[in-house]
Amino acid sequence: MKNIAIVGCGGMGGGHAVAIASGTGNAIWAGVPGQKEGKLQPTDTDIGPLLSLAGVCDIDPARVAWARERGYRVYDAYQDILDDPAVDIILIATPNHLHKEEAISAMRAGKHVLCEKPVMMDSHELEEVLAVAAETGKVFYPRQNRRWDKDFLIAKKIFEDGTLGRVFNIECRVQGSRGIPGDWRAKKEFGGGMMLDWGVHLLDRLLVMVPERVTRVFCDLTHVLTGEVDDGFKMHLTFESGLTAVLEVGTCHFAALPLWFLAGSQGTAVIDNWDCTGRVVRLHSWEDKDAKPILAGAGLTKTMAPRGDSSVETLPLPQVDFDNNELYLNLVDAIDGRAPQIVTGEHALRVMRLMEAAVSSAETHAVVEFEPALPV
């Protein structure tokens, strides 16, 4: 059993507190406003025997009162967590600009760290933190929980199992219409903006899905409703094999494109939303004869004529089994030396550097070379 304390008990930290205290972990944030009460699924591990909530710490009196109402121990200051010998792990869920100092002080106090994303403000901060992790021998674990999103795992399975033939384009979009939350996320000094908020998730997952060098990146940042930080972006990436990817985040989209779109030489897959409705349309056989021209708008086309029903088949999206709490299980196993980290600081560093390359592209309006080929 590991004792875990949480610094930062706002929306994310409060959700973590409820989930850890209840034993449901990532599976169900029971009791969080807007979330349904529920039970662990058969594939989900109860983390109750693995992790115990030691307490929380927050500077907001309202959040302190909230924690006390739930019966959680409240530390008066972060230093009190550092000084508590019973605490094994500190979960950092404060605004982004505080992560570096909190992580460093935690590891130097003998604690392991589970850190909310983005783990740092930039790659230089993360390099410092990883150096301290190596120096102290403590685990620094980036909390990239969206690797366990069902939609991503379905997309990854389709990409890997050859259903679509050679996949040549992957697109993933996260879209809303409410702008950026009106808190620290809208402030540059606190690490706000959608690149750091959602870009870190989309890039993390894409780099897990496609184990290749990223050779080029081009990006546009949007400032539709905000001037200080980006409220969205559209990023184009090219991998060494020629595969391309488009990642897009929008906070002023009142109608949404599909969450995932994968195009391959033998088919196409669409995942509509987080409920994972969608389909796979796969080539059944090539037609020997040319298509008949169709009227499209003001002219005829053979190229864009739809295929006959006999040449393609439409399939449901594949099913995936996964443990929502694998991150917590792996965290404990990594601390105890039973397994390597699934989410590593080195991978987070690559993601951070790629985000910086994307921002540089947006600022210069130019393609940025990212990971050039090694000399022969």
Give the label of every model feature segment.
Residues 44, 145, 266-343, 376:
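C-terminal glycine/acidic-rich active-site capping loop/insertion
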Residues 200, 248-256:
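Glycine-rich phosphate/pyrophosphate-binding beta-alpha loops
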Residues 89-96, 100-147, 162:
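Beta-strand-loop-alpha-helix segment that lines the small-molecule cofactor/substrate pocket
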Residues 72-80:
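Conserved SAM-binding strand-loop segment of SAM-dependent methyltransferases
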Residues 12, 139, 146-226, 365:
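Predominantly a Rossmann-like dinucleotide-binding segment in NAD(P)-dependent oxidoreductases
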Residues 89-91, 316, 330-376:
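C-terminal helix-rich "cap/oligomerization" subdomain common to oxidoreductases
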Residues 1-70:
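N-terminal Rossmann-like dinucleotide-binding module
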